[in-house]
Amino acid sequence: MEARILQSSSSCYSSLYAVNRSRFSSVSSPKPFSVSFAQTTRTRTRVLSMSKKDGRTDKDDDTDSLNYKDSGVDIDAGAELVKRIAKMAPGIGGFGGLFPLGDSYLVAGTDGVGTKLKLAFETGIHDTIGIDLVAMSVNDIITSGAKPLFFLDYFATSRLDVDLAEKVIKGIVEGCRQSECALLGGETAEMPDFYAEGEYDLSGFAVGIVKKTSVINGKNIVAGDVLIGLPSSGVHSNGFSLVRRVLARSNLSLKDALPGGSSTLGDALMAPTVIYVKQVLDMIEKGGVKGLAHITGGGFTDNIPRVFPDGLGAVIHTDAWELPPLFKWIQQTGRIEDSEMRRTFNLGIGMVMVVSPEAASRILEEVKNGDYVAYRVGEVVNGEGVSYQ
């Protein structure tokens, strides 16, 4: 399928690189509705920091155990912010926000790619960062069972480099093609003196749709259901503040070979985020899928419980899949504790599905047939939180 690039009166990609694509709208609409899959304190929040500790020039003791908070990102502070926002917008709580429209819900998600952009600037790899941008939002909205409809982007830079911007947009178009959604429009902002020369920032926004009778909200999950993990391509788009500190400690360059791997460190770290849309929607259509967790910031520890009803937790079997070489290198070089790894990175599993035992048997049989790769990574149990065996 070719990605559709649609035009509108306020923004059109026929004038793709026009700087003055700014839009402002004020609308009055019904109060949005959001299905809260769990307590709002479990809501994913991205917290970005540009502190000195986030930079590669920072020196630390090689014997210290690195962690995300010391790298400038405080997940707990993000959770506190969500609690405060929830007082003003009590409907939040899921991976995507739901808005009622007739017999369906529109499902919306927005995200960026974090400090992975810093590595894009260092490696010069710009043509896949747009795939990351699309993936972060569409992977969120499919957790409700929604089919992506359209995507919008925000590209901000100090001085517009048309060739560079073209590479970025090319990746966004490819991400939309993989997601089978339309690239509806976007905003290009040229902001002199705000960004360093040659640098830019990205944000994306995706909207999908799902029938009210088909929405996946986790309410039917019970103890004994099975967790199926879908493999990631690497770090995806979370945890790069910590990754960059590990890289600084290692004394390796992005052009050096990944220890234990088959590519350079730069290529391994910049591998685009997997877009799970087609695979997940196909599995949903076959039945038995009760919940979905996009494994982003917060890792397994924070994201999996978000789909459970109260009183349920999960047991993860860490030997169910092999930890990819990239994560082994990150943990060993940074002397990072297991608990920190599990709350920061996806560890090779980018999406977790909660399915009935019958659906699990079908999925694993399809894996044997070579249709795709998936792992039985755990089970739902009575209790709270996530334990590891």
Curated annotation (Swiss-Prot):
The lineage of its organism: Eukaryota, Viridiplantae, Streptophyta, Embryophyta, Tracheophyta. It comes from Arabidopsis thaliana (Mouse-ear cress). Residues 46-65 are annotated as: Disordered. Pathway: Purine metabolism; IMP biosynthesis via de novo pathway; 5-amino-1-(5-phospho-D-ribosyl)imidazole from N(2)-formyl-N(1)-(5-phospho-D-ribosyl)glycinamide: step 2/2. It is found in: Plastid, Chloroplast. The keyword Ligase applies. InterPro entries: PurM-like_C_dom, PurM-like_C_sf, PurM-like_N, PurM-like_N_sf, PurM_cligase. Residues 1-58 form a transit peptide. This is Phosphoribosylformylglycinamidine cyclo-ligase, chloroplastic. GO terms for biological process: 'de novo' IMP biosynthetic process.
